[in-house]
Amino acid sequence: MNKEYIMVIDEGTTSLRAVIFNKKMELLFQSQKPIEMICPADGEVEQSPLEIYEKTVEAMKDVLETGGLKAEQIAAIGITNQRGTWALWSKKTGMPYTNFITWMDTRSERSKPYFSTHEKFNELFPDQMDMMPPWNFVLSFQQMCEERPELLEIVKDSDTLYGTIDTWIIYKLTGGRSFTISSSSDHTGPFYVLGNMDEKYKSAELFGMHQDILPQVLDEADDYGRLDPDILGEEIPIFGNIADQQSSLFSQGCINTGDAKCTCGTGAFVNVNIGDKFLTNHSVTSYIAWTLDGQSVNCIEGVAGNAGTCLEWAKGQIGLIEDFSSMEDIAQSVSDNDGVYFVPALAGMECANYLVPSAKGSFQGLTVRTKKEHLLRSIMEAIAFAIANVFDQLEIIGFDIEKIYIDGGVSKSNMICQKLSNVTGLTVIRSKNTESTALGAAEMAAIKLGWMKEEDVLNYVESDREFIPDENRQRDKEEFEHWKQYVEVICNIYRQ
């Protein structure tokens, strides 16, 4: 039987999917499963490793059934995953010691007073605490140890393994035979601060972790092992593994220095290909984008907050919309925001130069005239403004960007794309394939299979629509300035 398909496992934040691509990199079938968010306390956002693995296997079986395919028709598996999310588990039993601590978790803030006077910490990470993201392992793990002191002994035990979601899934899918991580997931993981390769070993040293607790780092198009035949009845090779934002950067064809994309999903992330350069400051961070044949390409990244999370909240928690299909019409049923602005700090404020994990979201400018349409419009505008703010910071540090490739579920909004174009003054090109993270993982597996080369990725880039600045540009730029003022006010309140 011909092996003509690639299966991609896309481990997202709120759901996971199994997706089937053909040799033309066309998405044919998919199966999606929701993932429960576990919030034990304020600022804590976890997920169950066992639920994620079990639902991954369910999705893999479902997508084959949906497509009427057999496992022996799958040439390879590719994986892409949310980043900065980690767990500990036992090598002997394969059972987790902890839940996954997600990239949205902010418990790390509670550890900062402890480490501010910690001699060993300040020796290993001099003047770096303020640059540590909320998902930093050292800060989060210390807080966990306050409640579970036994974890300090667990990480010293040679039976204990650490991994991000890709490491866990590959470990389980291969029956424990492959303990690996991609260079992109490794470098955007919780062990790094400034991106220096020795930082993860410093973090391990701080807690006396045993030397084999960290997974082997591989290229993105590499051999990650074989699927346990007990799962689908076939030993399918796992040939691609790439972190989600880097995956969409690749599949959008951003393979040349200076190419920029924004992915708007649960969160909004801006990435720019910077070749072999490396730059990190308080607004943006450099990461490995991908490694092929041992050669790494780097990207600079700016986080633009919780895009999809805000819209899910608007729908599910406060009932501004009944379904997302009506969102655009409702927001545009009013001519402007009537002076209402939304500060999108529903899980802290993380937006380039605005990094205040303890901040809380708010509406500003409410009056007796304010309607729910204004509230919804202000939320959608805040998503565009947050992304524009990242490009502001990139311009300040010297990046000359001409156009923005945009993808992800939130990019389906014409209003958000147009607002982004107006505020930045740049052409915004929306991808026809809004599932670019899965596509990038399929392309990495295809490269390992010999079906394509890196430069062939440009053959699979399709645009849906281009947005250029229109007659509302001046108004939108003024509203952007007002929004930044409100964000600054809220951040200052919670910095105190």
PLM region spans:
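Short glycine/proline- and acidic residue-enriched helix-loop micro-motifs
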Residues: 45, 121-132, 296, 470
